[in-house]
């Protein structure tokens, strides 16, 4: 059932993807790591770090989630602790060793899998990454010192980036990278000496559609920006979340949250249509009233931090 996957599965997926990168430098595995790290893993922790839960539901419903048979494990809020708490220390282990998931070193050079701000020291070269990723797509790699010979700096180009849309500058000079991308990695090979590589990934809002074989998500749409998956919560969108329908050509805008618990996060504002039932009858031949409104979507990893309420990743489309 796709709506109640386990948190620890995301951690295992990252472990597996990283091992696969040791076998073959293929950007598909870096994509898997990135998506799991920014969504399926950090969503398990409350933003203040004091609470935790095991499942990554794509939908929660007060009165059902955590209560009804079959949904008791799908908690709508993170509990303080578990009788069997295997995953909290697993998260700590992963985060404290994050460097080896962000980078790889081979005989030919070094490879950046996820462009998070870091200082990385290798036998061949030292690299400092300056970025506000995943909110901002501008990433700068500073190479310190001089390499003894031609050395590869491989930079993962995420699969969510449209081909040809990445801007690359080396020491301020623009570079066409079309011929330099191999299996999802930009391969830059040269003798490095205090150089600077700047990339700009376009961080556009993207609609995501499920294969129609996924029955629960047929006719629905989800949203991503960069590697971040978004969700909708009742605290931001009054009424029943299932009453909202999003247009195929809906206007979508970004807004940086400037205060409160989500300060610094990029929120999405999406035009939608809201349906409201006329009367109290369970069934009626009177069509629902339709009104135009604007929905707010928040990063999925932040859900469940503002009280118990409805949450959905997949919204009805039109």
Task: State what each model feature region is.
Residues 175-181:
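Short beta-strand segments within Ig-like beta-sandwich modules, predominantly Fibronectin type-III
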Residues 27, 31-39, 44-145, 169-170, ...:
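C-terminal beta-rich recognition modules with glycine/proline-rich loops and embedded aromatic residues
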